[in-house]
A protein has these predicted regions:
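Short helix/loop capping segments that flank catalytic or ligand/cofactor-binding pockets
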Residues: 46-49, 59-60, 77-79, 86-87, ...
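CBM-like, beta-strand-rich accessory domains located in the C-terminal region of large
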Residues: 1-2, 83-217
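Carbohydrate-active enzyme catalytic cores, enriched for enzymes
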Residues: 1-77, 130-134, 138
Length: 217
């Protein structure tokens, strides 16, 4: 019925000639809205790293330099969650930096006023590289954090099965940093590692600097 009508190509597309997997690039930088994605393949159980650093306002959360990782069909490192807009938890938590995988300084992320007034200076993504087993992208979140940071760079270097995340940070004042990670599965600390497991998907998080995780008792 729909095939012979103008909207038919949307509701009943002919997929008989479509390739089994998309014949497009595995890495892409969407500079205008501040997203970059890198993946091992287009298979369903592939690994994908997605990085965000762009504008902050309204639907665009306070998550400059944040990232998520999908592995074997599971968002194994993810945002904290979501809720509907009228719920006070949306504006008080889920929109804010604390609900994302970012670095806090003295317990604070991006200014909470950016939700309704926007960030005067946006974040950026640069230098996307995909050489198959070596991938790279730089996230520059200095702008949205400029009330606290004079430099907020996050380098993502993906070599084979290891993703190195290097934070280059400089703040206006003396204080302490806090790294936020939101696991998408059971998290267990084993020695200097944090193991996150969800079904057949798992990831090992190891902090190298400024210090290792303390060994478990």
């Amino acid at each position: 019925y729909f095939i012979d009508r103008p909207m038919g190509f949307l509701y009943t597309p002919d997929l008989s000639k479509a390739p089994q997997l998309p014949e497009i690039k595995k890495s892409q930088l969407f500079a205008d809205f501040g997203w970059a994605t890198m993946r091992t393949s287009w298979e369903k159980d592939a690994t994908m790293l997605a990085v965000k650093s762009g504008h902050t306002w309204n639907h665009s959360h306070a998550d400059a330099n944040s990232f998520i990782i999908f592995h074997k069909g599971v968002d194994i490192i993810k945002d904290a969650g979501n809720c509907w807009y009228p719920n006070p938890s949306y504006r008080n938590y889920f929109f804010q930096s604390e609900a994302h995988n970012v670095v806090l300084f003295n317990g604070k992320g991006q200014s909470r006023e950016q939700q309704y007034h926007g960030s005067m200076l946006r974040g950026y993504l640069h230098y996307l590289l995909d050489a198959d087993n070596v991938k790279y992208v730089l996230a520059n979140g200095t702008g949205p954090y400029s009330d606290q940071f004079s430099r907020n760079f996050r380098h993502f270097l993906w070599i084979d099965d290891v993703i190195y995340m290097i934070d280059d940070l400089k703040t206006h004042d003396v204080g302490h940093f806090e790294w936020l990670w939101h696991p998408g599965g059971e998290a267990e600390k084993r020695g200097i590692d944090l193991n996150i497991t969800n079904g057949n998907s798992s990831v090992v998080v190891r902090l190298l600097y400024p210090r290792l995780l303390a060994k478990s008792d």
